Amino acid sequence: MPKMKSNKSVAARFKLTGSGQLKRTRPGKRHKLSKRSSQQKRNLSKQPLVDQGQVGMYKRMMLV
């Protein structure tokens, strides 16, 4: 049986922390930032944690 492949799009979007939680990036930080305030852009840089109800699904997709 061949090796299982991880979902590359999920692996690129999420980072696994040391405690087993997943960090994600916020959307809206790529282009057209001139209309946003400095505070908005700074808050978009923060990486929130994924909700606990979805962590298991994403970990299975990442083969962790």
From Swiss-Prot:
One of its GO terms (biological process) is translation. The keyword Ribosomal protein applies. Keywords: Ribonucleoprotein, Ribosomal protein. GO terms for cellular component: cytosolic large ribosomal subunit. One of its GO terms (molecular function) is structural constituent of ribosome. It holds the Pfam family Ribosomal_L35p. The keyword Ribosomal protein applies. Residues 23-39 have a biased composition (Basic residues). Residues 1-55 are annotated as: Disordered. Belongs to the bacterial ribosomal protein bL35 family. This is Large ribosomal subunit protein bL35. It comes from Chlamydia trachomatis serovar D (strain ATCC VR-885 / DSM 19411 / UW-3/Cx). The gene is rpmI.
